[in-house]
């Protein structure tokens, strides 16, 4: 039987040399929220703790300014 190989997670922000995660960079932020609007945890994405904190505050700031939705699944 083939052995399951899990790809090593790496921090995208460290690899790209990002200093600060901007709340206006919606394409990056959308990659780190689920379709229901929840923030994806770092154990899934592999993001380092420093960038995960910046990411969470940037997502929350973008939500507050109505750039991102708080929840995305409205069935009405």
UniProtKB/Swiss-Prot annotation:
GO biological process, one term: translation
One Pfam family it belongs to: Ribosomal_S18
Sorted UniProt keywords: Ribonucleoprotein, Ribosomal protein, RNA-binding, rRNA-binding
GO molecular function, one term: small ribosomal subunit rRNA binding
Keyword RNA-binding: yes
Lineage: superkingdom: Bacteria
GO CC annotations on file: cytosolic small ribosomal subunit
Transmembrane segments: none
Family named by the database record: Belongs to the bacterial ribosomal protein bS18 family.
UniProt xrefs under NCBIfam families: S18 (TIGR00165)
Biological role stated in the UniProt entry: Binds as a heterodimer with protein bS6 to the central domain of the 16S rRNA, where it helps stabilize the platform of the 30S subunit.
Subunit structure: Part of the 30S ribosomal subunit. Forms a tight heterodimer with protein bS6.
Protein name: Small ribosomal subunit protein bS18
């Amino acid at each position: 039987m083939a052995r399951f190989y899990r790809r090593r997670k790496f921090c995208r922000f460290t690899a790209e040399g990002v200093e600060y995660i901007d709340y206006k960079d919606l394409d990056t932020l959308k990659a780190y929220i689920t379709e229901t609007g929840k923030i994806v945890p770092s154990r899934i994405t592999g993001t380092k703790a420093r960038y995960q904190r910046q990411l969470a505050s940037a997502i929350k700031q973008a939500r507050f300014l109505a750039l991102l939705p708080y929840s995305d699944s409205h069935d009405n």
